[in-house]
């Protein structure tokens, strides 16, 4: 089922094009890295489309606007959690902006799990968000376990009924290991497998 999708030339080309974009992000500057982090903050408990639209509404203001201005922009864009996420964006900016790439890239180059642990110190960033961020800046050895991935794993019989909102760290790692095994059987990294599963579940590769 998944193998045939992986072998589909058109889908594979689209996935690999997205992978190349992530690899380019790895070489990009601090602004790009913080933009990707902001996207992951916005994606938590929201759809990717809603988060991406909110990020585009904010534009360059993620780098300098105050909390009230960010909150008002998010609200005007009809983003649901405008109060909380405005606060998280400001907190992240104060905590890591200007040194995010400098601190995370050397860690991720050596140990992606260690880099993920460091990112968990940012308010609003959990296992999924940290994994998502690292994948989007060119690291592919971590799984991004959201409801679409959970649904896929449940449907193929890899896991039982699971509430994605109550996913503990240990269970996340357990599911990640299952996905890594599937990825290994398909001769790819788990972060790239994610894009194929996402396409299968949503018919898009925008994640």
UniProtKB/Swiss-Prot annotation:
* Gene3D superfamilies tied to this protein: Helix-hairpin-Helix base-excision DNA repair enzymes (C-terminal), Hypothetical protein, domain 2
What Gene Ontology molecular function terms does this protein carry? Answer: class I DNA-(apurinic or apyrimidinic site) endonuclease activity; hydrolase activity, hydrolyzing N-glycosyl compounds
Q: Which regions form coiled coils?
A: none
SUPFAM superfamilies registered for this protein in UniProt: DNA-glycosylase
Keywords of the record, alphabetical order, are:
DNA damage, DNA repair, Glycosidase, Hydrolase, Lyase, Multifunctional enzyme
Q: Specify whether Hydrolase is a keyword of the entry.
A: yes
Q: Where is this site: Important for guanine/8-oxoguanine distinction?
A: 207
Q: Which SMART domains match?
A: ENDO3c
Q: Cite the HAMAP family for this sequence.
A: Ogg
Stated family: Belongs to the type-2 OGG1 family.
* Role according to the record: Catalyzes the excision of an oxidatively damaged form of guanine (7,8-dihydro-8-oxoguanine = 8-oxoG) from DNA. Also cleaves the DNA backbone at apurinic/apyrimidinic sites (AP sites).
Q: Report the protein name in the record.
A: 8-oxoguanine DNA glycosylase/AP lyase
Which organism was this protein described from? Answer: Saccharolobus solfataricus (strain ATCC 35092 / DSM 1617 / JCM 11322 / P2) (Sulfolobus solfataricus)
Q: Which gene encodes it?
A: ogg
């Amino acid at each position: 089922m998944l193998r045939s999708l992986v072998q589909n030339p058109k889908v594979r080309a689209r996935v690999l094009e997205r992978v190349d974009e992530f690899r380019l992000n790895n070489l990009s500057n601090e602004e790009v890295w913080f933009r990707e982090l902001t996207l992951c903050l916005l994606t938590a408990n929201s759809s990717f489309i809603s988060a991406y639209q909110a990020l585009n509404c904010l534009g360059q203001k993620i780098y300098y606007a105050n909390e009230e201005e960010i909150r008002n922009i998010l609200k005007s864009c009809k983003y649901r959690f405008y109060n909380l996420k405005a606060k998280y964006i400001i907190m992240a900016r104060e905590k890591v902006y200007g040194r995010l790439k400098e601190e995370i890239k050397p860690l991720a180059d050596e140990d992606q799990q260690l880099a993920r642990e460091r990112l968990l110190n940012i308010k609003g960033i959990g296992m999924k968000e940290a994994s998502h961020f690292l994948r989007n800046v060119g690291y592919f050895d971590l799984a991004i376990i959201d409801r679409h991935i959970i649904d896929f794993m449940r449907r193929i019989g890899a896991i039982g009924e699971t509430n994605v909102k109550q996913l503990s760290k240990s269970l996340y790692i357990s599911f990640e290991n299952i996905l890594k095994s599937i990825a290994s059987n398909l001769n790819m990294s788990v972060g790239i497998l994610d894009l194929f599963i996402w396409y299968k579940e949503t018919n898009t590769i925008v994640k």
